[in-house]
Design a protein with these regions (language model features):
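Non-heme di-metal
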Residues: 1-148
């Protein structure tokens, strides 16, 4: 909300953000309950979601360029997704500390390490793209300033 610099929009976005947070807590708690009831099945589902996740809007033409613009504004990017969403919920659920996961569930849990490694690589690659974008923007601003 603050990024838009418009008081009415900020207030509306604050309400949306609060509502989204309540949804996140609800779903996080539902998964936690699933882990208590059927840990192996829950880990398989967690794995499926993380392994198939794409950023909202991924299929929209020009998504990558728009994602970079959004990221440079500090709104959202793959690093934030990993650090603010994925890793905290995995810690909350104690995925890697649980002793009630076995068999196929254990394979899915171990493969979560690969997914996290892939997410870190994606975040690193995206940070490079973002840095190049910011560099281009700075050069463009310098050229504009030189014209004045």
């Amino acid at each position: 909300g603050v990024a838009c610099a418009e008081p009415i929009a900020q207030e509306l976005l604050k309400h949306i953000s609060n509502d989204e947070n309540l949804h996140m807590i609800f779903y996080r708690n539902m998964v936690e309950a699933g882990l208590e009831i059927a840990p192996n099945q829950a880990v398989k589902s967690i794995h499926k979601v993380l392994d198939n996740f794409t950023m909202p809007g991924y299929t929209i033409p020009g998504f990558r360029r728009n994602a970079v613009t959004i990221a440079t504004g500090g709104v959202y990017d793959p690093q934030l997704h990993l650090a603010e969403v994925v890793q905290p919920v995995l810690r909350k659920w104690r995925i890697f500390e649980r002793d009630d996961i076995n068999g196929e569930g254990e394979w899915y849990r171990e493969d979560l390490d690969r997914i996290i490694t892939d997410l870190k690589k994606t975040a690193s690659d995206f940070d490079e793209v973002k840095a190049k974008y910011l560099e281009r923007q700075a050069k463009r601003a310098e050229r504009q300033a030189a014209k004045v």
